[in-house]
């Protein structure tokens, strides 16, 4: 299921670097994202993760319903700043690479991060 396994390690590192650089610039420009209602962001992402987890085994990362949820996920991320294609892929890599983020997301479903990896990468490649 891991769509970004087809992407080169150099490109994946570029995605990680883009996330770090874009987030750092945004944090500086917005005084630590003070404009963002973090409680609402977390509630909105929770709604998406619960919807995905409810029937994850029957979903395809590329189906229209899933991609609509990922579009909503991206729109929530845009409340902080507008991530580039590479930074958005970098975000899902962070979910996979960071133990706390992996545990958090997989708390919704044991395969959530693996699924998000494919769904977000697909969304980024086709929509951003």
Q: Model segments located where?
A:
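Amphipathic alpha-helical "stalk" segments
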Residues: 1-128
